[in-house]
């Protein structure tokens, strides 16, 4: 019942105009700070804000306001069945409409995105950085071809030889319905590179998010593969390496040693943007807020406060 949702404290269902009509997206504001408001862009595409559930254990005591948000197509927002909506440009426009509805501006608006959310954050900044106070790019490279290369040449071979061979064979055949695929990755890839805990110890909210991913969005844009972007998926070949220099606002790039994304590339990105800082999570992987919170949160919080106080870059 949507009326009940609207009554929950901090929740705002925001109407979004699209080429296919109006839809509503879920946001939930936690805290209140006139100069530090962080909008969180989840990954996937098609995952949920629960990727950031544990931010509530770190940001409020620092006085930082943050906003959980499910992008269009995700579990707590409307889920139109129209694949023409799943483009980077339309998602950028959606973020801009959310920004306006929440009253965020260059005096208070920080954008944090992880994985696909990082991609969306960079694309948003390239178009609308005059609205931003700071940008935080977590666990996302600036070239999907280079990500693919890293996954196949560096991460894959870390698996037992026969396991990687079997995974690659399933990929070659496009046999992604095969339960063996998830079985092998669940044992040999996710606990090493996505969230470094045994699968039976993954946080409930992350399991819930994984079970709620919208395949209509995820598969259309990124495909089934965990070793790159499936041919035919709409994000194939995406890259903005050469445009990073055009991002001039204060930018934090967060990498992790065990990530699916190459931390060396992430560090390089922090030097390509005009005004960057790099944060490494040495114990972390793709969801480093969960497997390396000891480095992730102090580093992110310090960046937000340094930008706010004017100390960033001094």
Spans of model-derived segments:
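Conserved hydrolase catalytic core segment
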Residues: 107-150
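Conserved HGGG/HGGXW glycine-rich cap/lid loop of the alpha/beta-hydrolase fold
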Residues: 23-79
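Conserved loop-alpha-helix segment in the C-terminal half of the alpha/beta-hydrolase fold
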Residues: 241-283
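Catalytic active-site module of serine/aspartate enzymes centered on a nucleophile-bearing elbow/loop
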Residues: 275-314
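Alpha/beta-hydrolase
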Residues: 165-245, 249
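Flexible "cap/lid" loop of the alpha/beta hydrolase fold
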Residues: 135-176
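N-terminal cap/lid segment of alpha/beta-hydrolase-fold proteins
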Residues: 2-24
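Active-site loop/oxyanion-hole signature of alpha/beta-hydrolase fold enzymes
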Residues: 68-112, 116
């Amino acid at each position: 019942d949507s009326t009940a949702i609207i009554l929950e404290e901090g929740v705002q269902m925001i109407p979004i105009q699209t080429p296919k009509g109006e839809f509503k997206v879920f946001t939930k504001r936690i805290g209140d700070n006139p100069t530090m408001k962080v909008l969180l862009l989840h990954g996937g595409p098609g995952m949920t804000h629960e990727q950031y559930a544990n931010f509530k254990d770190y940001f409020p005591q620092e006085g930082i306001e943050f906003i959980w948000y499910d992008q269009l197509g995700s579990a707590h927002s409307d889920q139109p069945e129209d694949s023409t909506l799943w483009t980077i440009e339309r998602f950028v426009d959606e973020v801009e409409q959310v920004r306006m509805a929440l009253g965020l501006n260059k005096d208070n608006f920080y954008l944090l995105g992880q994985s696909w959310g990082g991609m969306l954050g960079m694309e948003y900044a390239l178009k609308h950085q005059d609205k931003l106070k700071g940008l935080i790019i977590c666990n996302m490279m600036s070239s999907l071809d280079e990500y693919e290369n890293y996954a196949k040449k560096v991460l894959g071979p870390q698996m037992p030889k026969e396991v990687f061979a079997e995974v690659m064979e399933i990929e070659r055949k496009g046999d992604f319905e095969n339960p063996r695929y998830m079985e092998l990755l669940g044992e040999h890839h996710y606990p090493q590179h996505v969230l470094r805990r045994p699968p039976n110890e993954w946080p409930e909210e992350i399991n819930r998010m994984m079970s709620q991913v919208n395949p209509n969005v995820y598969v259309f844009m990124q495909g089934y593969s965990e070793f790159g972007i499936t041919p035919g998926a709409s994000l194939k070949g995406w890259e903005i390496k050469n445009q990073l220099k055009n991002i001039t606002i204060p930018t934090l790039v967060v990498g992790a040693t065990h990530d699916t994304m190459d931390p060396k590339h992430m560090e390089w990105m922090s030097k390509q943007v005009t005004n960057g800082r790099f944060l490494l999570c040495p114990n972390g992987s793709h969801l480093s807020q969960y497997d390396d919170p000891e480095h992730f949160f102090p580093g992110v919080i310090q960046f937000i406060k340094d930008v706010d106080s004017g100390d960033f870059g001094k």
